[in-house]
UniProtKB/Swiss-Prot annotation:
It comes from Anemonia viridis. Belongs to the sea anemone type 3 (BDS) potassium channel toxin family. Blocks Kv3 voltage-gated potassium channels. Reduces blood pressure. Residues 20-31 form a propeptide. Disulfide bonds join 37-72, 39-65, 55-73. InterPro entries: BDS_K_chnl_tox, Myo_ane_neurotoxin_sf. This is Kappa-actitoxin-Avd4g. Keywords: Cleavage on pair of basic residues, Disulfide bond, Hypotensive agent, Ion channel impairing toxin, Nematocyst, Neurotoxin, Potassium channel impairing toxin, Secreted, Signal, Toxin, Voltage-gated potassium channel impairing toxin. GO terms for molecular function: ion channel inhibitor activity; potassium channel regulator activity; toxin activity. The lineage of its organism: Eukaryota, Metazoa, Cnidaria, Anthozoa, Hexacorallia.
């Protein structure tokens, strides 16, 4: 019984370590939480940010158009 309990504890600890490592990688993952969108009069595809009043910083957005209550942000 003690060996089985010890084995379960080891497996649980290993799962916690691997889950924490995966979360650290996810924090630095280079992806945006935006959907594709298109604005009339603008070439290419923009990023649709849902329920935002302005474009978030750090992504290089230079122009936008509003699609109420969302905003479509263009990087070029």
């Amino acid at each position: 019984m003690n060996k089985a309990l010890f084995l379960c504890l080891v497996v649980l600890c290993a799962a916690v370590v691997f889950a924490a490592e995966d979360l650290q990688k996810a924090k630095h993952a280079p992806f945006k939480r935006a959907a594709p969108c298109f604005c009339s009069g603008k070439p290419g595809r923009g990023d649709l940010w849902i329920l935002r009043g302005d474009c978030p910083g750090g992504y290089g957005y230079t122009s936008n158009c509003y699609k109420w209550p969302n905003i479509c942000c263009y990087p070029h």
